[in-house]
Amino acid sequence: MAATVMGMRSAVMLFVVLLFVGGAPAPTGANDPAASNAAAPNRAHLSSPPAAPAPATPVPHSPPYFKIVPASQLGKLGSSGSKPFFRGGTRSRAGVSSSATVSPRVATASPKIALYNGLNKPGENAGLTGNAGSPPDSTGAIGPSNYVEMVNSSIAVYDRSLNLVSRATFDTFVGQPSGVLLCDPQIQWDPAANRWLYAMLYCNLSNSVQRLLVGWSKTSDPSTLSSAGWCQFAAQTDPYLVDFPKLGHNSHYLIVGGNLYNETNPSTNPPFVSAAIVWVPLPASNTDTNCGTPSLGATPLGLKNGDNTTLAFTPVPVNTDSSATDGYVVSAYDAGGNVTALPTPQSRLAVWHLDAAGVLHQDADIPVTTYVMPFSAPQLNGTINLLDTLDGRLTQAVGDPVTGIWTQHTVNGAGNRSVVTWYKITASGSATTLADVGTISDPNDWVFNSAISPRFDAQGAAIEYNRSSLTTYPVIAAQIRIASTPAGQMEPGELVLATSSNFDSDFTCNNPSPGVPCRWGDYSAASPDPVQTNVVWGSNEFNTASGSTPAWADENFALLVAVAPHAPTAVAATAGDGSARVTWTPSTFDPGAPATSYKLTAYVGASPVATMTVAAATSATFTALADGVTYTFTVIAINPVGPSPESVHSNAVTPIQAATTQVPAPPTASRDPVLPAPAPPPPSR
């Protein structure tokens, strides 16, 4: 029989307590494993995209449902409701298509991607205080001096070597009692004003008291995790829960996009009402110690896509990595049945931009290849527990309007395996262009839960993601591209950053019934390094154990393109007896792939006459040289990518045989010969 997908709202997050505490029934029927194959024939492509409206249509912004106040004026928020429900992401198809084949993973070419300074370290995990929920909603951002990681429900600050500097649970961070559930975090670095920005949600699922929390650091130092170090505000959004809030900014505004659900009657499954875009003016100074209450702008209910007919869903503001004055917002037309009765193939991205005056404009849609909501991902060991791959929505966007805005989503691919489609969009005012598009796929694995970011120098991008299959526990992996990479592609190969040690089977997998996909994600992070401008940093999750208790763990990492080293410099030689000692200085190179060996060549005139290879070092001795012959030397550095150019020649040296000094025998002591005494004269007569 044909699959039926029941309407249900997005969820914020689930905590272990929900498994044991009574509450209203969870929504049902969204992921029937038996329905997956029957659903496949419904994946028809649209014959033609709808006509786009005139570009740059101003959007009204009177926010009757939003009011912003300092977080200190909220009083103490109550304990969050215990009603379990799921995000729209759980609409992911639960079944594994019968057309899928399983075979060993095909080896790829040696990857050009590498770790910056070897940085790939564990971050937050489900066992730490405040992190008992699932999924983690892993996110993070890099600044000049720190990497900041956020998960449900904690924040951690690291130095640029990923050593922990400070950590706090969200309730401590914003000054609320222990146990208040704050979730769906977002964190970004604002390079225009040298400060940090955040957004998160008060996850109150039981009544009409709803809050969206936003704020910024008072200085460029994020490590004081309280109101002493941060300006913190809360938008009263009663009665609407602003689910799946996504953060972005330009040089003037903090921008949040989200989906509104009416929480007036918590005894029912509240319906989706509208998407919303909210913006808060940022102080001009990068040192805001007064924390004056800002104004707030927001779209009215009923925000539509560029076709001016269908409701928008999950608008994603761009994390602008420059001083651009226009702040863009992108959204994929809903393929998951969140705003319609059933999942529907889509082929458009909606775009808005907020100008420097705080006016939001509806830009023309961007046509893209038709995409369909993905199937859920299987795991090793043939467990019934599949992994939620979300519902085709965009989850993050990073970049600059001129050099490129990068975004991505998980959609259905060949063999009904999920794939990640990424987009590069350029924009100027209301004019937007799809500059590039590509897909991350695997012949055997499901690929999902991705994040993409350009490099700060705009000379490439990195994408990280999860993948799993019936033969693979979930892994975190990444790929990279540079300016010369062909359109629509990444450089060959991938870098595996972390591998799960077991399949995920936590309490979310059986709520409301066995076979419902395990909550995974719901998103991950990628951001450009403003200091080491060819590096992209990220965070994503993997799993450490099976069982009903969440066992997710975050991995934080820094990625760059591995290149052959530059030529060594300052090559010098000193002659010996039939030998020469050669020294050199390793030249600067991308620290992701240091030299592992050096090749030395001896020259007589312009002709190479001998070579030798040594392990990584800064000196070596060339032996078996001919005395009396003049030599010069060059050095080549070698790493896994390849050799460097040859260095310049050293100074000329001439080995000579050590002079043999003839030391005379020590003098022997001697005396003049003793002559016999003359005979006495004969006696006289």
Predicted regions and their residues:
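N-terminal secretory signal peptides that target proteins for export/translocation
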Residues: 1-8
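C-terminal PAP-associated
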Residues: 31-563
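Beta-strand-rich modules
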Residues: 620-644
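Bacterial N-terminal signal peptides
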Residues: 11-22
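Bacterial Sec-dependent signal peptides at the C-terminal "C-region" and cleavage site
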Residues: 20-31
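Short beta-strand segments within Ig-like beta-sandwich modules, predominantly Fibronectin type-III
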Residues: 610-617
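Pro/Thr/Ser/Gly-rich low-complexity, intrinsically disordered linker/stalk tracts
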Residues: 563-595, 627, 641-684
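Short beta-strand elements bearing conserved aromatic residues within extracellular beta-rich modules
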Residues: 597-600
